[in-house]
Regions:
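Short beta-strand element of the alpha/beta-hydrolase
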Residues: 129-137
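Conserved alpha/beta-hydrolase
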Residues: 152-178
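C-terminal subdomain of alpha/beta-hydrolase-fold enzymes, centered on the catalytic histidine
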Residues: 276, 283-431
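Conserved acidic catalytic loop of the alpha/beta-hydrolase fold
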Residues: 190-208
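Conserved hydrolase catalytic core segment
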Residues: 151, 155-158, 205-256, 260
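The serine-hydrolase catalytic nucleophile loop
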Residues: 138-150
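Non-catalytic accessory segments flanking enzyme active sites
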Residues: 51-123, 332, 341-344, 348-363
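Glycine-rich "HGGG/HGxG" loop immediately N-terminal to the catalytic nucleophile
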Residues: 95-97, 160, 173-187, 221
Length: 431
């Protein structure tokens, strides 16, 4: 038990290392040769039919275990959920539909530090649109953001005003989706942040904002710490705000500090649950990602691994496959899982955790002391709901804080209209 607490204490992830100097990162590590090719190349998706047939065959050939011995998800992803998902995936799901949606959008690749970066880039038809780079996390992808492209780039068609328009840049993280897979070490969130700054320069933007949750928050906050003059501010739906005394208490497994407000106690309990029961996936990917051959070889293995990310997302997905109408559809969920399968990125995406674990230990949710303007949207079913006073302490230039009544970890995907409205309000002052 002591060893487990020590592992958890070290885990409380690791990306805040940039407190000690993200701005100096480029000097050292750019022994990685910069390629002179800055070409931006159009990109289309086409998956060979043989790959889709192979996927279906593998699903139908799944070797199932016995049912869990409990009535809930305390032993992991439940057999009934996985069998319902597998049945729909093999018999009804059509990858070509999302492939067509992707190919209807302007997609590109460009090489940064030796890795081809895939991104969607949609310019608004409205003048003076504010450029925004949006970063996904794990187990997400650019699929998460497809529903917000319309409301952000064409707000008039979705109840907004022309002056609310954004240009959107939505990259796939290195090792994820249609981006290239790094063949050397060193692609952790600091390197990704620097690559995104390069990407926005390459696209010719002299001002922009950044948005992210999950790894996207880490990347966006690190971009803010690097403070390129073009970056006006950031928005996060999974903020890093946990005070030091809270992190210390959680890591040691002691009682919460006295005097917490109701919101603070709720956040403490949510974080406590996540750290004690929700970190299995991150521990394995952070320590031994190459061992995950099973999820690279079995679509059901991959799907169950991705579903076991956080309890509330799992509950939502279970309800969807039971036939309930929720923020996500069965197609949404399978689009994302199938993207990971077809691009063979189960292990390459996991390496982002390993890369981060190699860095000096600091907490993923620990404040990074971002000095530029920050906006925060709190969705109730996120891993933890950051209290306003924590956000105010973490972000000296907090320009916006709002608690919503619906939505979770995949906020843009689950609640695209509400998420888009948050972006319009949060970044209004930068117009």
């Amino acid at each position: 038990m002591k060893k487990m607490k020590s592992v958890l204490a070290n885990f409380i992830l690791t990306t805040s290392l940039v407190l000690q100097g993200a701005s100096g990162f480029a000097q050292d590590r750019d022994a990685v040769k910069q390629l002179s090719d800055e070409t931006i190349r159009p990109f289309k998706v086409h998956i060979p039919q043989a790959k889709l047939q192979d996927l279906r065959s593998r699903i139908l050939a799944t070797k199932w275990p016995e049912r869990e011995t409990v009535a809930d998800a305390s032993q992991g992803v439940q057999l009934a959920t996985m069998q319902a998902l597998a049945d729909y995936w093999a018999k009804h799901y059509d990858w070509r539909k999302v492939e067509a949606r992707l190919n209807a959008l302007p997609q590109f690749t460009t090489n940064i530090d030796g890795v081809d970066i895939h991104f969607i880039h949609v310019r608004s038809k409205y003048p003076n649109a504010l450029p925004m780079i949006i970063t996904h996390g794990w187990p997400g992808s650019v699929i998460e953001q497809l529903k917000i492209i319309g409301p952000l780039t064409d707000p008039v068609a979705y109840g907004g005003k022309a002056e609310d328009a954004f240009d959107v840049v939505i990259p796939s993280l290195p090792g994820y989706g249609f981006s290239g897979k790094p063949t050397t070490t060193g692609w952790e969130p600091v390197h990704v942040a620097r690559a995104w700054i390069t990407l926005m320069k390459r696209l010719g933007y002299n001002k922009y904002v950044a948005q992210g949750g999950d790894w996207g928050n880490a990347v966006s906050e690190i971009m803010a710490l690097m403070a390129p003059p073009e970056l006006l501010g950031i928005h996060t739906n999974m903020p890093a705000t946990v005070p030091a005394e809270i992190s210390k208490s959680l890591a040691s497994g002691t009682q919460p500090p006295a005097g917490l407000s109701a919101d603070e106690l709720n956040a403490y309990q949510q974080l406590g649950f996540f750290y004690s029961k929700g970190l299995g996936y991150a521990q394995e990917m952070g320590l031994r990602p190459q061992t995950l051959y099973g999820i690279e070889d079995s679509p059901i293995g991959l799907a169950s691994w991705m579903l076991d990310h956080d309890a509330r997302s799992y509950e939502l997905i279970t309800r969807v496959f039971e036939g309930h109408k929720e923020g996500l559809s069965r197609e949404d969920i399978l689009d994302n899982i199938t993207l990971y399968w077809l691009t063979n990125t189960a292990i390459s995406s996991a390496r982002l955790y390993w890369e981060t674990f190699q860095l000096p230990k600091a907490g993923f949710f620990d404040p990074r002391h971002v000095a530029i303007p920050v906006a925060v949207s709190v969705f109730p079913d996120e891993i933890y709901a950051a209290p306003k006073n924590w956000a105010e302490k973490a972000y000296p230039k907090l320009i916006y804080y709002h608690k919503l009544d619906k939505g979770g970890h995949f906020a843009a995907w689950e609640q695209p209209q509400a998420f888009s409205e948050e972006m319009r309000v949060a970044f209004k002052s930068f117009r």
